[in-house]
């Protein structure tokens, strides 16, 4: 199922929520929104078309309609169809058709003392809710807090974020054993990135076969052990570039890389700019 991928922070902004009912034979009106429209069907079936693609959204399912795309009822409801709706705003997003249970697109970008960590928030454009009671509770609270005299305005945003994260968690479940191995490997590499750690070293430290460790990291984190180590090294390199006057050779050696030329090449490959350019940009920000 195609997905919509957001990069957070900042998180998408909640606007409003409500509920409604389509009577038997009634269709959804034709319109184009400037914001996202999340519709969760409680009972019945909603027949809706977005951008010339038709969907049947049954009870316990949701559909996420995108800004700028025309949507309308494909045909009338077969029975009374009750639903919740939620509008939120976010301009930075992309459509992707990749994978279903692979977390590679959700990979965390580690932050530093000057830069925020970045995460992926990805939702299928249509999905089945596994915990309908939780969804109903969140929507009811959002509707209550949307009342005119609500004294908890910030709670709406928190409830909305909880709802979105829950939908993502349901859509991207990872076997706990693989997840545990992947994060154990990640922690080990974070602690030993300055060393010449091989996949064999990692395997011996975790007491798992080399292929299994590598496979777990790729499925859960979307990177190989070597790629993860290099990301950790580049994060530390950025910290050193922004907080010290050390030469490239010293920084390369500090993060566990003997060849300054290869260090610079890898830094540009991962970060998009050279270490020298990065230092200049950071220096201008400080000034």
From Swiss-Prot:
InterPro entries given in the database record: AraC-bd, Homeodomain-like_sf, HTH-like, HTH_AraC, HTH_AraC-typ_CS
Gene3D superfamilies: Homeodomain-like
Residue stretches in coiled coil: none
Molecular function GO terms recorded: DNA-binding transcription factor activity; sequence-specific DNA binding
Segments of the chain annotated as binding DNA: 200-221, 248-271
SMART domains reported for this sequence: HTH_ARAC (SM00342)
Pfam families: AraC_binding, HTH_18
Signal peptide start and end residues: none
UniProt keyword terms in alphabetical order: DNA-binding, Transcription, Transcription regulation
Record-annotated HTH araC/xylS-type domain positions: 183-281
Protein name per its UniProtKB record: Uncharacterized HTH-type transcriptional regulator YisR
């Amino acid at each position: 199922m195609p997905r919509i991928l957001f990069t957070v922070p900042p998180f998408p902004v909640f606007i409003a929520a409500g509920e409604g009912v389509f009577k038997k034979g009634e269709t959804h009106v034709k319109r184009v929104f400037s914001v996202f429209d999340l519709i969760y069907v409680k009972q019945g079936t909603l027949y809706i078309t977005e951008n010339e693609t038709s969907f049947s959204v049954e009870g316990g399912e949701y559909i996420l309609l995108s800004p700028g795309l025309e949507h309308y009822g494909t045909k009338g409801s077969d029975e009374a169809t009750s639903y919740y709706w939620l509008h939120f705003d976010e301009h930075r997003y992309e459509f992707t058709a990749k994978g279903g249970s692979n977390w590679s697109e959700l990979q965390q970008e580690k932050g530093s003392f000057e830069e925020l960590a970045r995460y992926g928030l990805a939702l299928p454009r249509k999905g089945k809710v596994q915990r309908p009671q939780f969804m109903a509770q969140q929507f009811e609270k959002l509707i209550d807090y949307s009342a005119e005299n609500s004294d908890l305005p910030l709670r709406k945003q928190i409830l909305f974020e909880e709802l979105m994260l829950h939908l993502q968690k349901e859509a991207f479940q990872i076997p706990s054993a693989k997840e545990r191995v992947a994060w154990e490997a990640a922690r080990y590499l974070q602690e030993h990135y300055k060393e010449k750690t091989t996949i064999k070293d990692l395997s011996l430290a975790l007491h798992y076969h080399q292929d299994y460790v590598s496979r777990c990291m790729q499925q859960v984190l979307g990177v190989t052990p070597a790629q993860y180590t290099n990301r950790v090294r580049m994060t530390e390199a950025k910290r050193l570039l922004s907080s010290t006057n050390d030469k490239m050779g010293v920084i390369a050696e500090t993060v566990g890389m003997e060849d300054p030329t290869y260090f610079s090449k890898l830094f540009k490959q991962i970060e998009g700019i050279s270490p020298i350019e990065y230092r200049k940009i950071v220096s201008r920000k400080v000034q």
